[in-house]
Design a protein with these regions (language model features):
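Extracellular glycan-recognition modules
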Residues: 2-70, 86, 96, 100-104, ...
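Beta-strand-rich interaction surfaces with strong enrichment in secreted/lumenal proteins
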Residues: 14-17, 79-84, 113-115
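Short, solvent-exposed beta-strand-to-loop segments that form ligand-recognition rims
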Residues: 105-125
């Protein structure tokens, strides 16, 4: 069975989601094409913020140089524990419940922390952040945005691993 996925090479998709608020979830299947340790951030697969902002305002979900999931907002960057493999499909879910952030990798909790929420920002990006730095180099598939914080069981149901 053939399953086609969007292949990103420095570009990104932008959309507007009105009234998303500070509780939402994003589910993304990702395939990293960048060599490990090739740059400090291998790529941002999801972002929320004002388009072309000079600073990294807003928030983003991506991979650091080691291939670990990272969540970044205007004040801090949170890092997961597990390394992902290049050229292999993985599933990430970002769960934002106001000031609480959880990030799952292949159904397992990787990041759980408090983080300032982005409010009244309606612009979302796939394949990059609002400032266009370290855009995604690889594939993204079956991305979904939910207007609420998903439960742990719902996240596990999205990731069959």
């Amino acid at each position: 069975q053939i399953n086609r996925a969007a292949h990103f090479c420095g570009g990104r998709l932008q959309t507007r989601v009105a009234n998303l608020g500070t509780s939402y979830s994003v589910s993304i299947w990702f395939w990293n094409g960048m060599p490990i340790d090739s740059r400090p951030v291998l790529g941002w697969m999801f972002g929320r913020g004002q388009n072309y902002s000079a600073q990294a305002t807003g928030e983003g979900l991506g991979l650091n140089a080691k291939g670990q999931l990272i969540f970044s907002n205007e004040k801090e960057t949170l890092t997961g524990k597990a390394n992902t493999e290049r050229w292999k499909w993985h599933h990430a879910v970002l769960v934002r419940d106001q000031e609480k952030v959880q990030v799952y990798l292949d159904g397992k909790l990787e990041i759980s922390s408090e983080a300032n929420a982005v409010s009244s920002v309606e612009t979302l990006f796939l394949g990059g952040r609002n400032n266009k730095e370290s855009s995604w180099e690889g594939r993204l598939d079956e991305a979904a945005v939910f207007d609420r914080a998903l439960s742990e069981n719902e996240v596990k149901g999205l990731s069959p691993r």
